Amino acid sequence: MRHRKQGRKFGRTSSHRKAMFKNMSASLINHELIKTTLPKAKELRTIVEPLVTLAKREHKLRQELDTNSNEFKAQSVALRRQAFDFLRNKAAVTKLFEEFGARYAERAGGYTRILKCGYRFGDKAPMAFIELVDRPQVEEAADEE
């Protein structure tokens, strides 16, 4: 029986699953929008949201403490190391702490949005976009003819 068992297996070994979600998390942080299967998007949400909360905690510390104090530096480094321990991607950790901490400072959770987008052509797997809310919109250049 699977009573009280959390998470999905996706037909993969635990190491494969862990590597897959590390890569997907880094991609979501870097691009702020990715397309994947619906179950993977739902599972990814449970991984990315705590990482954004770490960035929010560092942003709050930045406002409360002097950025040159040893207490701030120690706590900031500890939070960044926690994020890097999972992501293993310096660019993603930098973007997470420098952009997302300030962007989501006033939001109390719910940093991601899942939008269903039909079914995959080959196997009819339900597909979805997962995006970070309040992301800057890139405007397409309109063709003037």
Curated annotation (Swiss-Prot):
Gene Ontology molecular functions: structural constituent of ribosome
Ribosomal protein recorded as keyword: yes
GO biological process terms, semicolon-separated: translation
GO CC annotation: cytosolic large ribosomal subunit
Record carries keyword Ribonucleoprotein: yes
Entry keyword set: Ribonucleoprotein, Ribosomal protein
InterPro entries to which the protein is assigned, alphabetical: Ribosomal_bL17, Ribosomal_bL17_CS, Ribosomal_bL17_sf
PROSITE patterns associated with the record: RIBOSOMAL_L17 (PS01167)
Pfam families on file: Ribosomal_L17 (PF01196)
Family: Belongs to the bacterial ribosomal protein bL17 family.
Subunit details: Part of the 50S ribosomal subunit. Contacts protein L32.
Protein's name according to its UniProt entry: Large ribosomal subunit protein bL17
Organism from which the protein derives: Francisella tularensis subsp. holarctica (strain LVS)
